[in-house]
Amino acid sequence: MAGQTTVDSRRQPPEEVDVLVVGAGFSGLYALYRLRELGRSVHVIETAGDVGGVWYWNRYPGARCDIESIEYCYSFSEEVLQEWNWTERYASQPEILRYINFVADKFDLRSGITFHTTVTAAAFDEATNTWTVDTNHGDRIRARYLIMASGQLSVPQLPNFPGLKDFAGNLYHTGNWPHEPVDFSGQRVGVIGTGSSGIQVSPQIAKQAAELFVFQRTPHFAVPARNAPLDPEFLADLKKRYAEFREESRNTPGGTHRYQGPKSALEVSDEELVETLERYWQEGGPDILAAYRDILRDRDANERVAEFIRNKIRNTVRDPEVAERLVPKGYPFGTKRLILEIDYYEMFNRDNVHLVDTLSAPIETITPRGVRTSEREYELDSLVLATGFDALTGALFKIDIRGVGNVALKEKWAAGPRTYLGLSTAGFPNLFFIAGPGSPSALSNMLVSIEQHVEWVTDHIAYMFKNGLTRSEAVLEKEDEWVEHVNEIADETLYPMTASWYTGANVPGKPRVFMLYVGGFHRYRQICDEVAAKGYEGFVLT
């Protein structure tokens, strides 16, 4: 199941740098670019064989972004904004990876990256206020600052079904897909998981496979993407005001041009509700989540919108029994990540597609021949695991990160992640996270969050060097206040009611803690700016 790499040579990392960055996805590349611009010595360590991060590994058929391409891109370079032309409303994985490569080539970023290399440990030296970082190749690098740009969805979560290693057929995980095309023609294929990757990959497999079995435990809410080619005239007009357009997105709750409807879903008639939601449905995309101001705050308001979507599913899938099993129930709409689908529900009208409800007939074991549930065995040629990721903390915990007093980050966060502003954590000086727990992160346009975080962290590092300071550490009391604030705001919404990867519920044994800041990107950005303006209030600088 290992993914193949694409760059053959391995660059020897330097022994000492001002800043070491872990990860060469969108976050790490921008950190590298910006620190170079600020005149600091910087190097990036990356496990993969090339740039791309999540878009390097997730090459499964149908993979695409759920943020519109014109907003899911860097805004720091006017040249890049003008030179690159997106072709679709929602860019596919190959196009996003081409874009990342375009940026890496344009700014010669690969010259500052060591590929094929995994950071295994990082320890803070209190005597020198530096980090000592070890890799799986025996490299040891000393850095004043350590930036974790290791991604929110970079550690695939494998199911703990007995017998998984005994399966004799082809086994794939959507989060670590082969680089060469996979042909499912004539095969009996099983897909386990119906989150974002499962809903994206299944319709593509259904076009090839002789038979497709979709193993579903929890139905998800999915709405039409209405993906389409972008009009060249539209792009030309947009580029005349692209910088202004992107700045507007930085002043919104989600970091995109999605605006909250002013009305309550409880104050409108059935006719008005259906008319409004139908308009969003036909337009496609996730904006239906913002159709009314109380969708994510009031259970009754949420239920009215949820039932509209359930009826859409019932009206799409011809078999009423299958349709009802696909209808999400038992949790509020939008509290799991809203999925954009292309032909997913229509797929179940195909004769070669079968839904297996594992709530009523749980998977008991993986056999050499396929999947056995409590009812029967399904013989398969290929099995696709669309079982998600150990989100937000998974990549951090794969590294033995030790701070003051040799305390491990994994130990400090044993009951759940604790950060100040999502940027740093007390007891771990000179360590910064990009789009980590306690920040808007995955609840926002990731590119907007990434740029804001990278700019804040690199500005802070520049401030430290300018003022002859060598140690920046979050104050524990401020961290506690921030965690309390994050939880208070989350508790004003319906999010914590639902078991999701936002709360770590998809990983056995992981603490159930809501890990994201739901107060809005614009509000979060303002808080971070105020902290910086006050001489980095909440940090002890020495």
UniProtKB/Swiss-Prot annotation:
Residues the entry annotates as binding FAD: 27, 46, 54-57, 66, 72, 119, 152, 446
Keyword field contains Hydrolase: no
Details of cofactor binding: Binds 1 FAD per subunit.
Family of this protein: Belongs to the FAD-binding monooxygenase family.
Lineage: Bacteria, Bacillati, Actinomycetota, Actinomycetes, Streptosporangiales
Catalyzed reactions: phenylacetone + NADPH + O2 + H(+) = benzyl acetate + NADP(+) + H2O
Assembly with partners or alone: Monomer.
Oxidoreductase is among the record's keywords: yes
Transmembrane segments: none
SUPFAM superfamilies, per database record: FAD/NAD(P)-binding domain
Recorded GO MF terms: flavin adenine dinucleotide binding; N,N-dimethylaniline monooxygenase activity; NADP binding; phenylacetone monooxygenase activity
Function field: Catalyzes a Baeyer-Villiger oxidation reaction, i.e. the insertion of an oxygen atom into a carbon-carbon bond adjacent to a carbonyl, which converts ketones to esters. Is most efficient with phenylacetone as substrate, leading to the formation of benzyl acetate. Can also oxidize other aromatic ketones (benzylacetone, alpha-methylphenylacetone and 4-hydroxyacetophenone), some aliphatic ketones (dodecan-2-one and bicyclohept-2-en-6-one) and sulfides (e.g. methyl 4-tolylsulfide).
Thermal dependence of function as given in the entry: Thermostable. Displays an activity half-life of 1 day at 52 degrees Celsius.
Cofactor(s) the protein requires to work: FAD
Site (Transition state stabilizer): 337
The protein's name in its UniProt record: Phenylacetone monooxygenase
PANTHER family cross-referenced by the UniProt entry: L-ORNITHINE N(5)-MONOOXYGENASE-RELATED (PTHR43098:SF3)
Positions contributing to NADP(+) binding: 64-66, 194-200, 217-218, 336-337, 501
Keyword field: FAD, Flavoprotein, Monooxygenase, NADP, Oxidoreductase
Record note on pH: Optimum pH is 8.0.
Gene: pamO
EC number: 1.14.13.92
Pfam families according to UniProt: FMO-like
EC class (word): oxidoreductase
